[in-house]
Amino acid sequence: CIIVDNPLRDLNGLTKLASVLAQESNQVFLVPMYFQGHDVPSIAPDIVITNFLRPPNVDHVKKYRIQGSLVGVLDTEGICKDIESYWHVTNSSGILSTIDFYLTWGLIQKNKIVNEGALSKNRVFATGCPRYDFLFLFRKRAQTNSNKIDNYILINTNFPLLNPAYSKSMDEEIKNGRQVGYREDLQKIQIMHVEKAAHGFIKMTKQLARTLKNETFVVRPHPFEDETFYSELSKLKNVKIIKSGTSIEWVSSCKALIHLNCSTSVEASFYKKPIYSPGWLDTSELREAALKNLSTICENVDEMALWLKQQ
């Protein structure tokens, strides 16, 4: 059984993984995360690959072990920003002892787990991310855009901490973050920076839409964001707010991507799309160095508009 977290983000890659495993004569089940408590015990698989290992799902993992399943983690989040804090809390809580193996996005994460003494070296494997494996294999295929919008500039937002779709409030998000190893004081500092950046992102979009009136802008909220946060942008004739569809189909069909520390910039790089980031909204508390290196960093809206005019 492979647990699927967010279908818009994860289903393509995990389906590819399931296909590869099935070709090796394995029977594979893709199980929605919120149905795993019922479906996994009913299937009683030999192996369960869960999407993360944190306090909220430890009871599930323990039950799978009791029923005789091997349990591994293929973390769909890849890496948290405060990796030192995350692994310290995760390891000190003892929950890593409940699994048989861990599949990481890269060697940094693998080495951190091993160096913390959380799991032995022969139980941790740097496998990469199925989402990017899918892109690597299929990036040359034409993607079908179900909304039939052509020649658009894609703006991907990345502010679920401020604007959660599945939590009742920011306080609940902070509580959830604390449970998975994020320090509360750092979260509160980050929220201040995220709030400023999110409102700046909306202002930026308005300015670009008014400056480049002949361009179509598609604002695609993060899968874990509430899209109503951006409803004021829908008043602009050349701006569309669309959460449906996968990031792959939107990125593959766009003429350029605008983002702020969003991992879809990695996907855009596979498709060799122009990638722009509003440097004036970024801060050290938000910055992801690897993603920054993929992007053209603009110092203001006017500079970004000049770059976009060339596309």
Where in this protein do the model-derived segments appear?
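Active-site and donor-binding regions of nucleotide-sugar-utilizing enzymes
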Residues: 1-143, 155-158, 162-163, 265
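Soluble or luminal CAZymes and related metallo-dependent hydrolases
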Residues: 13, 105, 193-203, 296, ...
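Active-site regions of enzymes building and remodeling cell-envelope glycoconjugates
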Residues: 27, 45-48, 69-70, 234-242, ...
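Hydrophobic/aromatic beta-strand patches that form the interior of the parallel beta-sheet core
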Residues: 29, 49, 72, 101-103, ...
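Short acidic active-site motifs
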Residues: 35-39, 245-249, 303
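Donor nucleotide-activated moiety binding/catalytic core segment of transferases
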Residues: 55, 199-202, 218-266, 270-271, ...
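Conserved catalytic-core segment of nucleotide-activated headgroup transferases in glycan assembly
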Residues: 137-232
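Catalytic binding pocket for nucleotide-activated donors in carbohydrate/polymer assembly enzymes
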Residues: 231-236, 263-311
